């Protein structure tokens, strides 16, 4: 009986934590229309290996970092699925504040593809509703095949 009560109370506690986490996500603002558009167009440029276009969305520091590692970035961009995206959503939003770095508003997107691939795409801006220049750009591919 005590074990059942302990398990039940643990389930309620975990459900409450999940609800609190969702409320915290909902409290953060969504990206502005300009930020959303920059994020989508930057992902499309990366996916199509159009780095000249991609760099137009970046802040100077991120652009310099990409240029320094462009060969590796081009190889990785080829692994991005080329099929149509079947589902797209904002998975998470974060605000990072640090005394030694500028603030960062990070939005995590999940792009699902019909061939059972999932792309997690993190894009960072200075703040929610702020500049549409990208400060952080990270892409991860999950799945069986990229063809």
Model-assigned labels for residue ranges:
Residues 37, 52-102:
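Short solvent-exposed beta->alpha transition segments
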